[in-house]
């Protein structure tokens, strides 16, 4: 029996099984089997010549972040790439115009953001149809995904693309599950949860059965939140990508205001017309917000800060002085003594800080060496 047939068999059995407390154990085992078969299906061709990425797909990462345009053929991805970056991608009114991966660069707020126009996705991509597998594989390397939808048929396309990406282990606008999973040499499967958690979807028997399906017989599993069977399987698989996503509703000039108001309820969405250049500024602002980039200006001793060439790094807890130094050159941190920081992250201007200080957008930093 082929993998595709095995997957179909498991999916059929899941469809026949009623979802209730009595069947949750059985469904958990079926979901684990399904995840295993799908992984094998996706990884299978990588051992042979069929796994070749194809012309234009081996695009080296450039700039401060990478953004991928994913959508069905002829939804306006190539036009959007041209309008945002000035990079020319062949545009026509028929499907499958783009056959390779076209890179461009957005220069925005001092940052260089690589934008990839990927070939149009088709249903069944996760199962290897068309070039969808290659498209989604590149999507896994992106810091942000823009799903471009045609305003005339947005919800149908949205559902299909989400299913294809999910089948390839890409989780959109989600955080990694709060589960600690650690294999060990002996002691069996130990399942526990933190005191503030009352698990309703995972119990010890289900966890043990799923682990047995993966031939894992010794492990510690700690729930730090109320997680689902699917989330536990994601943790065991260990190859899931959690990436922010913006739904770009293109060709809004072809629908009425009333229809646009209805579509406004879609979360994480921006309406545009790439052809008429409507609302592209709002899209750029949203891209900047979702990438969580910050600009840090360098200040040589005795000189004014360099406002023309900011150092662009990811914001949040990762945006430490050490990250800032390593972004410039990894030798700086070895000679680091302290930093003087001006800006919203400083308690007073300037503040003397160590390498663990977390920076904010548009901070000014002067490095003092040993």
Curated annotation (Swiss-Prot):
Residues that hold GTP according to the record: 71-78, 117-121, 250-253
InterPro entries reported for this sequence: Beta-grasp_dom_sf, DRG, G_OBG, GTP-bd, GTP-binding_2, GTP1-OBG_CS, P-loop_NTPase, Small_GTP-bd
This protein's UniProt keywords: GTP-binding, Nucleotide-binding
Domain OBG-type G: 65-292
Gene Ontology cellular component annotations, sorted alphabetically: cytoplasm
Gene3D superfamilies for the chain: 3.10.20.30, 6.10.140.1070
Source organism superkingdom: Eukaryota
Keyword GTP-binding: yes
Recorded GO MF terms: GTP binding; GTPase activity
Annotated PROSITE patterns: G_OBG (PS51710), GTP1_OBG (PS00905), TGS (PS51880)
Biological-process GO terms, alphabetical: cytoplasmic translation
Transmembrane segments: none
Domain TGS: 292-369
Family: Belongs to the TRAFAC class OBG-HflX-like GTPase superfamily. OBG GTPase family.
Protein's recorded name: Developmentally-regulated GTP-binding protein 1 homolog
Species this chain originates from: Dictyostelium discoideum
């Amino acid at each position: 029996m082929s993998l595709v047939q095995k997957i179909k068999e498991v999916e059929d059995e899941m469809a026949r099984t009623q979802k209730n407390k009595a069947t949750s154990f059985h469904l958990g085992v079926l979901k684990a089997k399904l995840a295993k078969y799908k992984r094998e299906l996706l990884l299978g061709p990588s051992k042979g010549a069929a796994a070749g990425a194809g012309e234009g797909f081996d695009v080296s990462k450039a700039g401060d972040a990478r953004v991928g345009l994913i959508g069905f053929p002829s939804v306006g991805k190539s036009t959007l790439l041209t309008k945002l970056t000035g990079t020319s991608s062949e545009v026509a009114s028929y499907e499958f115009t783009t056959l390779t991966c076209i890179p461009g660069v957005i220069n925005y707020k001092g940052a260089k953001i690589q934008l990839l126009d990927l070939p149009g996705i088709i249903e069944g991509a996760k199962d290897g149809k068309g070039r969808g597998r290659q498209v989604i594989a590149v999507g896994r390397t992106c810091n942000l995904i823009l799903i471009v939808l045609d305003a005339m048929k947005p919800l149908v396309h949205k559902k299909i693309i989400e299913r294809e990406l999910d089948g390839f282990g890409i989780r959109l606008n989600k955080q990694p599950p709060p589960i600690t999973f650690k294999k060990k040499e002996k002691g069996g499967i130990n399942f526990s949860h933190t005191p503030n958690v009352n698990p309703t979807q995972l119990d010890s028997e289900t966890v043990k059965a799923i682990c047995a399906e993966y031939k894992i017989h010794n492990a510690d599993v700690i729930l730090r939140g109320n997680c689902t069977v699917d989330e536990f399987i994601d943790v065991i698989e260990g190859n899931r990508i959690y990436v922010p996503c913006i739904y770009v509703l293109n060709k809004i000039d072809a629908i009425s205001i009333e229809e646009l108001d209805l579509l406004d309820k879609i979360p994480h969405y921006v309406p545009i017309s790439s052809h008429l250049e409507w609302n592209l500024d709002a899209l750029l602002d949203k891209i900047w917000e979702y990438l969580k980039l910050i600009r840090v200006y360098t200040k040589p001793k005795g000189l004014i800060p360099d406002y023309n060439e900011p150092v662009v790094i990811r914001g949040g807890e990762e945006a430490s002085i050490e990250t800032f130094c390593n972004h410039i050159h990894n030798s700086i941190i070895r000679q680091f003594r302290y930093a003087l920081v001006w800006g919203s992250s400083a308690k007073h201007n300037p503040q003397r800080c160590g390498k663990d200080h977390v920076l904010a957008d548009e901070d000014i930093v002067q490095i003092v060496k040993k």
